[in-house]
Amino acid sequence: MTLSIWFSLFTICLLGAMSPGPSLAIVMKHSLAGSRLNGLATAWAHAAGIGVYALISLLGLAVVFHQLPMLFKAISYAGAAYLAYLGFNALRSKGGIAEKMELGHAVSVFQSAKEGFLISILSPKIALFFAALFSPFVAEVSGLTEKTLMVATPFLVDGLWYTLMTLLLSSPLLLTRLRRNAVIIDRLSGVMLMLLALHILLSVS
């Protein structure tokens, strides 16, 4: 794999990570707790899900989806259901994690990591990204070193991007403003998650 091919891969992964969606909403939700550890756990668990997709892309993800279209539909429906579940909870929330922290009910790092991992592994958008845009790079790699680099690139790009988002969102000045509007943010993220769930259902039906 030449440097130019790797840079193309890096650019595609960065643009994919930067695109707004439910992943950012979940990282934002957990960073609002005031604990960077929660946000970082969400970010790197999300990146772990990205790494899983990168790994199975090496094993022929696009071919699997082509031969087993019901598998992609199953992932899409599961992802839509999970987004709807998160959206419903956000709409009912009275301040989300920030409220729980103020009441003394700390949100565990495991819970943050679990939501981060599930939001990536159950995302049909991410599945399609790897099947359509990532898989073509598989033909350009050979040997363990290049294959390791191919899996590590999207994992690190995603993890570092959401680490940056966590650090920005958990800065004291911004965090104070966000916590004042935690209920509004929860409502907006809830609506966005529900609309994304509906969009996924309509696109695969």
Where are these regions (language model features)?
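Short, flexible, glycine-rich and Lys/Arg-enriched loop motifs at helix boundaries
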Residues: S170-L175
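Selective transmembrane alpha-helices of multi-pass membrane proteins
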Residues: Q67-A98, T153, V157-M165, T176-S205
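Hydrophobic alpha-helical transmembrane segments in multi-pass integral membrane proteins
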Residues: A54-L58, L122-A127, A131, S189-S205
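Membrane helix-loop-helix hairpins that form the core translocation module of multi-pass transporters
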Residues: L37-S112, L198
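Juxtamembrane transmembrane-helix termini in multi-pass membrane transport proteins
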Residues: L3-K73, F129-P154, T163, L167
